Swiss-Prot record:
Pfam families: AAA_5, CbbQ_C. This is Uncharacterized protein SAUSA300_1302. Belongs to the CbbQ/NirQ/NorQ/GpvN family. One of its GO terms (molecular function) is ATP binding. It comes from Staphylococcus aureus (strain USA300).
Length: 263
């Protein structure tokens, strides 16, 4: 199946990302959860025909998750030997591929300084497990993404942040959102799609006002909703895809109110 490309009514978002990539700049995609940051990175990877290695950050991320680890392997002579298995950072550097670091502000600040040399003009790292000095081959690029104001995120270290050029990625809307729904979900009826877009606009407004979490207004949740609407009533589809994910009763009630206004 062909990759469904990232779309945005603001063409500068993708065009600038492509320009920064061509200049070999580290790109930091900044925006609300579910706004399409990963889709943008995947689209860029396809457009430039360069594979992408992904790191999903969390508080449990450690150096081995980034660089790799040692393990015991049986060689052709039947003898056991210790070998190093390259992690996503070293693989991307050696192969001239894209390194995508998702939710980089979820990682503990003390984990990421190991990447400083990778992210500056040197484009190299000394593997702390083997002593090997790895110099990135041409084609290697770094894209990272952060969710704004998301639970569990930490402020980015200034030294790390200064190694990136930032592109803000906001939610899509209007005709672009309508086309994305038609291309990436099972829902095709124009009238229902218009209702869903209006409902999503209300959710985004409530999210910006702090009444509900960003995830409730995400494009990801919206596309799930559109699929479910084709097999069940819209009210139940909203309950399954959005409301039941929320723990706060006030957030749930706010969305129930939006449902009553829109459907």
């Amino acid at each position: 199946m062909a990759l469904k490309h990232y779309k945005n009514s603001d063409s500068t978002v993708f065009n600038d990302a492509k320009a920064l990539f061509d200049l070999n700049k580290n790109i930091l995609l900044k925006g609300p959860t579910g706004s399409g940051k990963t889709k943008l990175a995947e689209t860029l990877s396809e457009v430039v025909d360069t594979p992408m290695h992904q790191v999903n950050c969390s508080v449990d991320l450690d150096t081995e998750s980034l660089l790799g680890f040692k393990t015991i392997k049986t060689n052709a002579e039947g003898q056991q030997e210790i070998v190093f298995v390259d992690g996503p950072v070293i693989k991307a550097m050696k192969e001239g591929h894209i390194l995508y670091i998702d939710e980089i502000n979820m990682a503990k600040p003390e984990t990421l300084p190991v990447l400083n040399g990778v992210l500056d003009y040197r484009r190299q790292i000394t593997n702390p497990y083997t002593g090997e000095v790895i110099k990135a081959v041409p084609g290697f690029n770094v894209i990272a993404a952060i969710n704004e104001g998301y639970v569990g995120t930490l402020p980015m270290n200034e030294a790390l942040k200064n190694r990136f050029v930032v592109i803000h990625v906001d939610y899509i809307d209007g005709d672009i959102l309508k086309n994305v729904i038609k291309e990436q979900s099972l829902l095709q009826g124009d009238k229902q799609i218009e209702q869903i877009i209006k409902f999503n606009e209300d959710l985004r407004t409530m999210s910006k006002q702090g009444q509900i979490s960003e995830e409730a207004a995400s494009i990801r949740a919206l596309l799930d909703l559109c699929d479910l609407i084709t097999v069940m009533p819209v009210e139940r589809a909203i309950k399954r895809t959005i409301i039941d994910k929320l723990e706060d009763e006030r957030e749930q009630q706010a969305i129930y109110n939006a449902v009553e206004l829109n459907f």
